[in-house]
């Protein structure tokens, strides 16, 4: 009985670890899809940061500016998941974004069940 319980607990831990890794992956992809493309023009990133392409008061772009930090974060995601990110920019990008969003929700659901037991 103890061995069976140990194996189940070990298996559950493996499922938890793998689900956590998948959740992180799909979170990154969904997050990056909600930002301008990495190669988007500066105007798109300005609009993302300020809500307009021609802000009246532009914050100084420094090493810690929102635009620069977001672009660096997207670049890391591009490097980590190049094929998945390319799918988001492709002809079927909306499909892939929807898939990634659904996968993120599913892995969050699995993790919630494991953590709460419900």
Model-derived features with residue positions:
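Short, charge/polar-rich alpha-helical segments
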Residues: 2-71
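Generic N-terminal initiation segments characterized by hydrophobic and/or small/turn-forming residues
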Residues: 4, 9, 66, 85, ...
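Generic structural signal for well-ordered, non-membrane alpha-helices
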Residues: 21-28, 83, 105, 109
